[in-house]
Amino acid sequence: MRESFYILFPIPTYPPPPYGGAVQADGITSANTVGYSGTAINAGQWYLVGVQFADVASKAETADFNSLISTTCTPGAIGDFSDPTWGNAPMIQVLKANGQSYTYYYYISDADDGNGNYTATAWVDDQGFSLTAADVQALSKGFWFKSHTAGTLTCAGQVSTLSEFERNVPGGQFEIVANPYPVALSLNAPTTSGFTPGTIGDFSDPTWNNAPMIQVLKANGQSYSYYYYINDADDGNGNYTATEWVDDQGFNLTGTQVPVGAAFWIKSLTAGKFTFGL
């Protein structure tokens, strides 16, 4: 894969929130359940999108952007190595394994159609080349999306056939995680293992202390909601002995915290694992 070494932001601080749509049955033929989630895209805004679908009939449960995504946003020109965000093409940024920089993809109308004609409208890499097998995205990953024009973003494909899905999270760096199933997520719904619970931060600096931390973009697009993994949460009987995710004041979580089609940031001093289930 051809990768740029330029960073738009090391770890985004205040990007706009994602907007996930409901999942419905699709007309695609498949032995497995097929669905989609839709997002209304505003011009010039960032969206954090969760990968919750794979290519139809994919045994590896992966997808590339040309099969995963369809968009009505206007294709454009890609950036260059002096500034990969310079052009006006819709852009995807995928966090690299180092948790510090991104790989860039662009939506253009003069991509190679496979026959040497540069007339295809497609996602390409940061040099304008067609995507390869190295560019596929796995379920439970996430990516940033931005377009200079308004439109819609639809993620569609095969829903995971696994009744349980494990996602490993490295220690000591930020990671983007998405629910692998196309439903809204309560952070305490998946089984959490490996993470060392700690002490939450405070309002002067919510990242200050040592508890594993999740950040979910708020609907206002200006700030995050913070959640922490601690071992002195209320067990429901007034005993502060439960190990679970809590809000930034240490209170138990209710409802769901991550919308359909969205993803979230997590950082933990120790490596851990989420086990998602249906």
PLM regions with names:
Residues F9, P17-N88, K96-Q100, A133-N210, ...:
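A short, polar beta-strand/turn micro-motif
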Residues G76-G79, G99, G114-G116, G201, ...:
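Small-residue-biased low-complexity repeat regions
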Residues I92-V94, Y104-Y106, W123, F145, ...:
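Fold-core signature of tandem repeat domains
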Residues Y102-L139, S225-V258:
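A cross-kingdom feature marking solvent-exposed beta-strand/loop segments within repeated
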Residues P180-A189, F195, F203-V258:
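Contiguous ligand/interfacial binding patches
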